[in-house]
Amino acid sequence: MGIIASAVAFAALAAPSGASAAAAPSDVASGFWARSQIVWSVDQGWMGTLSDGRFRPGALATRAAAARVLAHANQRVNNVPFQPDAFTQAVTAGWITAGDGPRGAITQLEFDRAIVRILGIGSSARKLNTLRAADGWRPRLPRGFGAEQAVRQAGGRYNAPAGADDSETWPSSQLERTHLAVQAYQLGHLSGWWRSAVTNQEAVTSALPAYTPLKKQVLGFAIRYAGAPYIWGGTSASPQTLFGTRVQGGFDCSGFVWWVLKLQTYTLADGTTWSGDAQIAWRTTYDMSAHVPFAKRIARADLRPGDILFWSSNPKGRLTDSSTIYHTGIYLGNGWTINSHGSGAGVTLDYMGDGAGWFHDAFAFGWRVLPKGR
């Protein structure tokens, strides 16, 4: 299935240093996946507890609680004094709307758009929404595409561990208090180079080449799911049962490739159809790569849009040992890929050309399943 070990500007979802010094809320178990982030958020005053000391991790976050996190983030990023009436501050500043009032719920997308405003990356988000190919073709972008991509590049999102996949969020999901606490921690620990990561992302808006009719369908379909959560073992945008547990829709890296290139049938204007079902018979990243004959492995310089990509812990081009392959994605062209990975908290568009760090250095080879000329 595969997972990226590094690569982008995301604070690791590991135990925050010094977090153990503060006491955890009484209803946050010692083994809870976000315990350290909750402890940090409460200890730093970014979030609060009830009068009895409970945190209520599974409860929906209120707009007032979200505003409090945003006000602290604004203080951290922009050196603006924190205002106790954070809800009024957030509404007045235009970070969020009043909605159903301070006790109302807030969606992931509205919160992420507020982060975009506070970080001052609105122009990047708006530019990302102009994504188009060289011939003027524009894919149908998911709602909030620019904001969700920008926030991920900045480091404002996270990926829950496999055992907590039921807590992952789509942009339309209502935030729970656990999600809010983890994002508070992310915002309190942004990397020193998050601005350049977001600015560099803008280049994709003018990077896509002209596509054939089939590639417009295939890659347009893939882009439609940008922002979907990373779900270990996930192969569907709909709720799915994985390892005996019912979780929401989402994809791991090979699951996204499987969803786009194997499970779909694409119909062209002339009535002809195409599906990669017969060619892609292996579900995991390792199995996919292991069944690609050496003669069909594609070097970086020969990649074409729609090719399946593989990354390795010991890349040696077409001679890479498949046992070292641990990530996969789909090539968009001109050095860009669309892929689902934990470091990006789901499906993102990423640059893999010169200077791209891990995405460039760990690339092994590609595999072509789309028919030539289509």
Q: What are the functions of these language-model segments?
A:
Residues 45:
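Phosphate/pyrophosphate-binding loop motifs in nucleotide- or prenyl diphosphate-using proteins
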Residues 66-69, 111-118, 180-187, 250-263, ...:
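Active-site-proximal alpha-helical segments within enzyme catalytic domains
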Residues 216-219, 266-349:
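...with weaker cross-activation on analogous glycine-rich loops/strands in unrelated enzymes
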Residues 15-35, 48-149, 158-177, 187-212, ...:
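Feature responds to low-complexity, polar/acidic, surface-exposed segments characteristic
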Residues 359-374:
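Low-complexity, Gly/Ser/Thr/Pro-rich intrinsically disordered linker/tail segments
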Residues 40, 72-76, 116-121, 149-154, ...:
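Glycine-rich, acidic and aromatic/proline-enriched surface loops and short helix-turn segments
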Residues 1-21:
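Secretory targeting and sorting signals
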Residues 200-270, 322-324, 338:
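N-terminal capping segments
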